[in-house]
Amino acid sequence: MFSILKKLFGTANDRTVKKLFSEITKINSLEPAIKILSDAALKNKTVEFKEKLKNGATLDDILYEAFAVVREAASRVCGMRHFDVQLIGGLILHRGMIAEMRTGEGKTLVATLPAYLNALTGKGVHVVTVNDYLAIRDSASMGKIYNFLGLSVGCIVAGMTDEAKRIAYNSDITHATNNELGFDYLRDNMKYSMQERVLRPFNFAIIDEVDSILIDEARTPIVISGPVNDNSALYGKIDKIIRLLNDSDFEKDEKLKTINLTEVGITNIESLLIKDGIIKPDTGLYDFENLNLVHYVNQALRAHHMFTVDVDYLVREGKVMIIDEFTGRVMEGRRYSEGLHQALEAKENVKIQNENQTLASITFQNYFRNYHKLSGMTGTSMTEASELKDIYNLDVVAVPTHNKVTRIDLDDEIYGSKQEKYDAILKLIRDCYNRGQPILVGTISIEKSEELSSILNKEKIPHNVLNAKFHEQEAFIIAQAGRFKAVTIATNMAGRGTDIMLGGNPEMLIEQLNKDRNYVAKTAEIKAQIAEEKQKVIETGGLFVIGTERHESRRIDNQLRGRSGRQGDPGKTQFFLSLDDDLMRIFASDRISGVLRTLGLKNGEAIHHPMISRSLEKAQQKVEAHNYEMRKNLLRFDDVMNDQRKIIYEQRTEIIKSKDSYGFLNSTTEELARKIVLTFMPLGSYREDWDIDNLTVELHRIFSIKFDHNLVHKNDVTEEDITKLVIQMAHDIYKSKEEAYSSELMNNAVKYILLTTLDQVWKDHLYSLDHLRQGISLRAYAQKDPLSEYKREAFNLFEQMLNNLKELFIQTVYHFHIDLRHLQKEDISLEHKKLQKNMCESREDPAFSKYNAGNSIETYLKPVVLRVDPKDRKPDDPMSWGRVSRNELCPCGSGKKYKYCHGAN
């Protein structure tokens, strides 16, 4: 019944596309008038559009004409004219939706339409890609169109200076990677002035490969962190013990990806820990004094039995590097959290880095929800349409192809064992190679790609291997995978974003000839050669894509298939499976094994059965649902932190922007004074119950007030009188500092103290939340909802953090005993910059800042200690010396140079 209705009325997607096609006629009707414009007149359209917007027009009012202008500019500058289906893609993106467009349909060119239109507002547009290569490539190629029309273009890649980034972000259109955008957002919110920040307020983002960024990478938050205590020796000791365990000591569940010690395992590991002197005799692993070791043992177990080298990570140049399970790429700068990375380093016998403490973090889910408008493009997102709608409120619209898809998708072939499967794959590769048909073989891991490469080497079949180990050549290798007789092995979607053209990619080959004297002649030669090769490849049947396993996600399988048959080219795809494959073994083996027994499968024989295909699809749906739940759960927890993060970041920005810090100081002083007085002189209490001694101590600790006991003994004095007196005394202390150093200088110093104190308590709060998060799931055993418990406790911790902020801030301000008479305003600004430089530029990679996680507020205040007049220095009081040059005589009077005396330490 449903299928009949679909045929009659079409799907919701069909109806949306039909509506959009009616708008395309309006754009096309403007083409003749736009086409006859001179270059100068065409460029001037940008000025006209901006003027219209200034006078109250909306983007939708100028949409059709703007799209027609971009189409004509692209035709003149790049020789590429937007097809009607590309205009549809542009409309979808402008309206804040996701355009699903097949591989080779020109998504990069599509983005120019909404990017140009939305950049006319002057608020900036971010075009987001998955790696630096694509960001550089797209900004260079599409930037010609924007520049022709008078718009500026920027490109953000790793390693740029803040000044260069600031210029790029202030461009009308900025191409950047998702990682750099996220890290720059976090870094900006660790800076000390608005001038040092690089990002503008969020406006509009167009995400290329949107499924990869918003779904595949959503489970991994981006983190700026700093090292904490060095526990590398303990990781090494635990690793040696874990190696001695056998299979009966633990049980693992591959479906749930969990591993736990058995009772026997606990007994064995306790005896080994006692033997090595790690725990005391007669104590157990789960005794209170040893509970911290459970974490190390669990992570070492996971490292050895749940993570596989060249599948989940690789070892390069003495470092453990994470492999993205979806793309096969190395995730530069990423480290597993909670000690897992250290456990892997111990397992692989490489240098163990310190554990990290989070200084700032955010998930891509919450980062991209900051944008006023968000849209994206991908070749495959319909399978995740509900998730994109639920989490990001993004609708997915499938755009028709410009040319009909002629690719043939063959049925899966299922074999009894991995060896039989490889034999069948080898036979097909040999057949294709002999007739010259290019082949792309997709694997799910580096390990599998190297295994297959080894088989082809033995058979003397020339081929290229594309995986995380060779990512530098990624774009070039994948671009030439469509050449005559080419055999390419690629992990998953490595090289995604680069088209595979039949006969080869002329632009990539020409790029290598830039420095050749015979550049022009060779360019023509290459184009002719590729045109000839393309015809030969078409005659062989086009690109043949072979999948060696089904991925957990149907979308990844579809992406692999989509490599073949671009823009109406011929091609074939086929998956080869075996009962040894992870997906089959873990999720579908029982059901499929029963079918195979019924059919009586013989050695080396393949089967094609609808029930097996259905079973595989159900298994994939099950895994997809599980992964979706994980991402949704991560978001639920991160939303708690995100609410707090927004408050802190907004507060921090207000502090930086404010010209007067006295308001916050004044209100906080009054609040703390009232709180302290009422603590030791409770309302309604008798005078003899007042704790004046401790009140005196506390007032000196917080405000540096020397409180006179006799003031309390006056007749008729009340708690309110004492509170007012304390507030006045605190104000007098501040006023005396202001008179000594100038109000402007004190205002800058107070702002600096407030910012550094806020950073300190926020960092400590994140540490507390990390610990709370790690153990919160155990509340489920007490019939409590972990999320509700996390929300409640996180709120309590946040309140506690705000109280700590106020106390630490006030205490630091009122205990200023530094001689600031010679301190200039620009000196504080300079010290801000130095501190920020140390925070951001000393990191090893974007996710691992060496910003000292252990610094106290006193450490942060060191930069304020600058020049002091030598005659004001007291020999027996180093605090009065201020900054001393290393080659000056030491102020203590020893006669030695400062660097050899008190400065030696």
Curated annotation (Swiss-Prot):
- Residues bound to Zn(2+): 890, 892, 901-902
Please give the Gene Ontology molecular function terms for this protein: ATP binding; metal ion binding; protein-exporting ATPase activity
SUPFAM superfamilies (alphabetical): Helical scaffold and wing domains of SecA, P-loop containing nucleoside triphosphate hydrolases, Pre-protein crosslinking domain of SecA
What Gene Ontology terms for biological process does this UniProt record contain?
intracellular protein transmembrane transport; protein import; protein targeting; protein transport by the Sec complex
Top-level division of the source organism's lineage: Bacteria
Q: What is its main location?
A: membrane
Membrane topology term reads: Peripheral membrane protein
Residues the record lists as binding ATP: 86, 104-108, 499
InterPro entries, A to Z? Helicase_ATP-bd, Helicase_C-like, P-loop_NTPase, SEC_C_motif, SecA, SecA_CS, SecA_DEAD, SecA_motor_DEAD
- Kindly state which keywords UniProt assigns to this record, in alphabetical order: ATP-binding, Cell inner membrane, Cell membrane, Cytoplasm, Membrane, Metal-binding, Nucleotide-binding, Protein transport, Translocase, Translocation, Transport, Zinc
Q: Where does this protein reside within or beyond the cell? A: Cell inner membrane; Cytoplasm
Which PROSITE patterns does the record match to this protein?
Answer: SECA, SECA_MOTOR_DEAD
EC identifiers of the protein:
7.4.2.8
What CDD domains is this protein classified in?
DEXDc_SecA (cd17928), SF2_C_secA (cd18803)
| Gene Ontology terms: cellular component | cell envelope Sec protein transport complex; cytosol; plasma membrane
Record text on cofactor binding = May bind 1 zinc ion per subunit.
Note whether Nuclease occurs among the keywords: no
The yes or no answer to whether the keyword Zinc-finger is present is no
Question: Which cofactors must be present for this protein to function?
Answer: Zn(2+)
Q: Which reaction does it catalyse?
A: ATP + H2O + cellular proteinSide 1 = ADP + phosphate + cellular proteinSide 2
In terms of Pfam families, this protein maps to: P-loop_SecA, SEC-C, SecA_DEAD, SecA_PP_bind, SecA_SW
Give the quaternary structure: Monomer and homodimer. Part of the essential Sec protein translocation apparatus which comprises SecA, SecYEG and auxiliary proteins SecDF-YajC and YidC.
Its function? Part of the Sec protein translocase complex. Interacts with the SecYEG preprotein conducting channel. Has a central role in coupling the hydrolysis of ATP to the transfer of proteins into and across the cell membrane, serving both as a receptor for the preprotein-SecB complex and as an ATP-driven molecular motor driving the stepwise translocation of polypeptide chains across the membrane.
Give the family from UniProt: Belongs to the SecA family.
In Swiss-Prot or TrEMBL terms, this protein is called Protein translocase subunit SecA
Lineage per the UniProt record? Bacteria, Pseudomonadati, Pseudomonadota, Alphaproteobacteria, Rickettsiales
